[in-house]
Amino acid sequence: MQVDKTTLADLSIFHSEEEQSVFHHLNHTQTNGGREYLRHLLGNPLNTLEEILDTQQTIQLLMEVAKDWPITVTNGTIMVIERFYESQLTNFTQHPNAVNSQAYKIFYNHDYSLLRYTVEHAVEFTKGMQQIVDLLYEKKLSKQLATWVTRLSMLLSKPMIQELMRADKKNLTPAEILRYGGFIRYHYKQQNFELVDLYSRFDAYLSVAWACMKYGFTFPGIRQSKDPFIKASGLHHMLLEVPVSYDIELSPDKNFLFLTGANMAGKSTFIKAVGVSAYLAHLGMGVPAKEMQLSLLDGLLSNIQVVDNIIKGESFFFNEVQRIKNTIEKISDGKNWLILIDELFKGTNQQDAVKCSTTVIEGLRKMQNALFILSTHLY
């Protein structure tokens, strides 16, 4: 699905005040990496039906196992492992034994303490990753999850890592600490970074799973169709504490929804609710609705929060016209689009706004490849 930064801002997918964003409401991640990967997911909608359905399956399975998810992997543990590779070790011995490891502990106590602390966290980290494999291994996995679990199994299959998992972290000898620490530092660096990356992905998708359960989201039925359509019942805006629910149906023979009403009547909220739900559907995520069916859309564009640009000398009305012009050019490609327009031409006087709006609406109605929702108080 094609989407631009303006649309992401209009729908509050991200927001400068984070608590007002969709991202914030979906963010139940436990790690910095998971948070950043969730941000990546929300900024990159999927393009194929196969990807969307596979992601739905991923999230639905994680919803099933969320309460059994291992808690041994923490953000602190991951940070310890990452920073270990940034630290310097003095006169580290590659062949530790009972004598030289004890000497290292005495003469290089600071470095030894770092090694011990890191190895203790590595024990918990590898155990936690193995617990994820054990939790998911016999489940009916999505292609995405199957790929991750297979790779996890391979990374954890190293004999030294298997030994590390079985270690009692509170009773390690100095020689064991140096041996495990040396292996992690000099022979398992890239693998550890890959494990961290995999956990970030799990963390991000698990976050969405928790959000879907918390907010009672449902997974929409989505299918390929040459004719665009959206049908939903009980659809509401996920950012509102006490939302109003809507029913909506758009199809090629009813592809233009024209909203009228006084200011603060809820027109903008309705438009954004439809946009957010359609967008989440194309991320493979659940949506805030009792039920939703829609076609795979090629793009989503909005014209909601237009601003002027003093530096460039561009007026509010000029930017409105440019946004509409660019929108029309994009949707002239014959692909399936959802177009959201709130208060068209509010940057000019009422007489000109009526004339401009009428012209634009008459032109848009001829485009059967797109679904339109347009609001106005000019009626």
Regions found by a protein language model. Name each.
Residues 116, 123, 182-196, 311, ...:
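Short amphipathic alpha-helical segments with heptad-repeat character
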Residues 55-58, 62, 125-128, 198-201, ...:
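Generic, well-ordered alpha-helical scaffold segments in large soluble proteins
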Residues 125-138, 210-217, 284-286:
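Short helix-capping/linker segments at secondary-structure and domain boundaries
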Residues 86-99, 144-174, 200-258, 262:
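Amphipathic heptad-repeat alpha-helical coiled-coil/stalk segments that mediate oligomerization
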Residues 22-27, 38-41, 180-187, 261, ...:
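Short hinge/gating elements
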Residues 215-379:
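ATPase nucleotide-binding head domains, primarily ABC-like/P-loop NTPase cores
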Residues 1-165, 191, 195-205, 235:
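Conserved amphipathic alpha-helical "coupling/scaffold" segments
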